């Protein structure tokens, strides 16, 4: 590793890239201060043989300020405190990784701090058997890079190599991955390479880590294409390898790649994909551009990412079922939108968007369905609502089941948001734990203005209210388990060669020898096939269908043809 420190038989070698500094000293707490040697690229290096695991350190800069290591492996006292030397040793018995094929992926997105009452890696470990029984094949963990305080979504992280101290630190995360692997569950880590958080970022004093040309609304964005960008790219790519080698993660979710601007001949996303694929892992991107370039192979000038999120799919179902038309939902709302998303993935694939006031997106062509991840809830779509309401609070139970079937039985990769599978009713708010009064006030006002959030993001109550209650609705949980089982048994993944028909309030999807029937309001449907009932959301559906007309109540049914 180029950045941070390295332990070997000669001692500990520290390496800091800080070209803005003329001199840097290493301060080992309670041991001493040592002058570091600078090379012509701005790297400061020193090897010490009197340093051991558990020692804490900072760097002293030209102005005598002390800063933590930007590649710190652990920040036991938070983003402003000393960095700590940790041992990479761990007794792994997980056989290194779980290799899950895209067509077998059923993802479960969770936030460590609110998934259990403990809010720790250990708390998640206690629920792994439950997740295995649910039928998911991978857990996707929201960012765990060290952020300010003890409560945050994770997207305000500032130490990309340091595991959040309040969650259980690096040893706790290693244990979680190890235990997940023993049950055959893959671990996908959500990482943020489009920006760093607004508090605790000392890299600005060290070198050109951040772009002077591009901005994000969340914090400074990394410099991937200007002077000094070679070292910044290395900093990011080594971070990818770090999570794979040191923590055995099986894949990554890249946050908001539309906010990663890189005009280099080779885009950083392609570089990231190359590193991930070198280790036979997977990488998934969040993008709101509706651009197949993200997942297209290199021979089609793509970045070769394995899959990308599809917000259009969510918006179509949400707007149709709830009737909401505010904000971006104004572009959606008809049953035809659901049909188009089933057929073409993106609804806006070169169409004019009234919300954006421009043409948006591009056709995905014949890319297979497992290049795309769909959902009816996620941390953004729930947490960026003013009241943090989950879908279960916005629609009736039958509509909720219809929504679940629409995405779990789709040809795309389904992603469940924690608690959704049993009808969790607690809200999921945005919360933070900053210490800067001006920043705190800015966040409060911004969330109120942009999202209508009246709850205080800094309040412990907001955080605690967002924790799962684990009050399980057995009927909904059983339905989710059945959907996941059917998806696997009937091989419904990836194949986009479907026959989709619809009326004003109903939709049928035929493929893989099955017919899925979705009835949004009592309707008469003329069936063109004969089949046997496999699963239904209620008892109103006939056990057998033939080529005739049926008056069906609201709900969902799947028939084997």
From Swiss-Prot:
UniProt-recorded name of the protein: Malto-oligosyltrehalose trehalohydrolase
Temperature and thermostability: Optimum temperature is 85 degrees Celsius.
Compartments, record wording: Cytoplasm
Keyword tRNA processing (UniProt): no
SMART domains: Aamy
Recorded consequence of changing residue 355 to Y: Very small decrease in specific activity
Pathway(s) served: Glycan biosynthesis; trehalose biosynthesis
Principal cellular location given in the protein's record: cytoplasm
Chain's gene name: treZ
Similarity comment text for this entry: Belongs to the glycosyl hydrolase 13 family.
